[in-house]
């Protein structure tokens, strides 16, 4: 199974970092956002993940939103935000390191999960997303690549990447078309406001389906790169569970109630948490959201207050000296605006012609 979306890698560029506090261990990833490195805190020895983003125009609203929203979240199923550091060339976002890698890679290795294993991870995903919603934050880009695992024997799932998250406290209702095509809810593709929390439910359903089946529900397996066909199938809620995948009636019922085109009729997060399939063998620490969040009140509060962070972000919008034009990434050859306009005329649907579906790593 291929990733739902992948962006091109950037050019190599030296990255300066806070040598007084962290030391480099190794590179752990790169994408449209920049470069990610595994670092070690010199004082404590703790490992952290650091995401480096070029100073200047890349420090946009999405980056600022990611940091502000992520900082407000404290839950065992969400990657911990630690601090931001301004280097001469980059903004560095320091986060908890999840040594188990992506849930995506685990599924690729296994092919697909048993129903019990899928439920084990789905329960944790719902616990984390439900907490986000209780904090008035909708993620808007939930996918396997944005769910990491710690290194324990029974892995704890960790949600990451809040670049497209939206807070109903700080922002208006979502309207822009963002996310990864395979996971996007039908209403997100339409030119109107939508409930980001209900759209997150759909994306959680796609994650559950992929864990059980080992394929995306709305992709054509013979033409997986045809994003227009994927979008058509999403809008028509056209999916099926293969005959070779044997799941319980309760599991099938939950999937059917998630994949509902009308968001007003779709199962809600509280209803999922009370669904018989979800409740089966649920760990005690996931039973009560209040208990979960209270247990996670760690002594290491964020190192920076919001004023410090906003000042760093403001400075980060100023490009590094002499780096103009360096480390620019190639854009995907797919012209999404034209594609959406074509679909508008082909399908007689009111599609957001300026929709910003983003294929991020």
Swiss-Prot record:
Segments spanning the bilayer are none
Q: Where is the active site?
A: 141
Q: Which UniProt keywords apply?
A: Abscisic acid signaling pathway, ATP-binding, Cytoplasm, Kinase, Nucleotide-binding, Nucleus, Phosphoprotein, Serine/threonine-protein kinase, Transferase
Tell me its EC number(s), please: 2.7.11.1
Q: Which SUPFAM superfamilies match?
A: Protein kinase-like (PK-like)
Induction (free text): Down-regulated by ABA in roots. Induced during incompatible interaction with the bacterial pathogen Xanthomonas oryzae pv. oryzicola.
Give the function comment from the record.
Answer: May play a role in signal transduction of hyperosmotic response. Can phosphorylate BZIP46 in vitro.
Q: Which family does it belong to?
A: Belongs to the protein kinase superfamily. Ser/Thr protein kinase family.
User: Oligomeric state and partners?
Assistant: Interacts with BZIP46.
What protein is this chain from? Serine/threonine-protein kinase SAPK9
The protein's organism comes out as Oryza sativa subsp. japonica
């Amino acid at each position: 199974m291929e990733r739902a979306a992948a962006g091109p890698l950037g050019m190599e560029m030296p990255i300066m970092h806070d040598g007084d506090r962290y030391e480099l261990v190794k590179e752990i990833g790169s994408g449209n956002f920049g470069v990610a490195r595994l670092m070690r805190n010199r004082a404590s020895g703790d490992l952290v993940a650091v995401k480096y983003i070029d100073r200047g125009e890349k420090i946009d609203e999405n980056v600022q939103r990611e940091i502000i929203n992520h900082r407000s979240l404290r839950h065992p199923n969400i990657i911990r935000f630690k601090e931001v550091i301004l280097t001469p060339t980059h903004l560095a976002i320091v986060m908890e390191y999840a040594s188990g890698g992506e849930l995506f890679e685990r599924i690729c290795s296994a092919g697909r999960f048993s129903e019990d294993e899928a439920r084990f991870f789905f329960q944790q995903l719902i616990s984390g997303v439900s907490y986000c919603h209780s904090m008035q934050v909708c993620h808007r880009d939930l996918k396997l690549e944005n769910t990491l695992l710690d290194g324990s024997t029974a892995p704890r799932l960790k949600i990451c990447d809040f670049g497209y998250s939206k807070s109903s406290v700080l922002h208006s209702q979502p309207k822009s078309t963002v996310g990864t095509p395979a996971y996007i809810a039908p209403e997100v593709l339409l030119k109107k406001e939508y409930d980001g929390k209900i759209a997150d439910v759909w994306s959680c359903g796609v994650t559950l389906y992929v864990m059980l089946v080992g394929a995306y529900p709305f992709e054509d397996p013979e033409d997986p790169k045809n994003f227009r066909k994927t979008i058509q199938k999403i809008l028509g809620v056209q999916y099926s569970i293969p005959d070779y995948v044997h799941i319980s009636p309760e599991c099938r019922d939950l999937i059917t109630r998630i994949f509902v085109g009308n968001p007003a009729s779709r199962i809600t997060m509280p209803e999922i948490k009370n669904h018989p399939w979800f409740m089966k063998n649920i760990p005690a620490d996931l039973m009560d959201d209040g208990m979960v969040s209270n247990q996670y009140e760690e002594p290491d509060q964020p190192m920076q207050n919001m004023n410090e962070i906003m000042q760093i972000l403001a400075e980060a919008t100023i490009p590094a000296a002499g780096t103009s034009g360096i480390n620019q990434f190639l854009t995907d050859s797919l012209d999404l605006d034209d594609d959406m306009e074509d679909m508008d005329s082909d399908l007689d649907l009111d599609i957001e012609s300026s929709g910003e579906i983003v294929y991020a790593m």
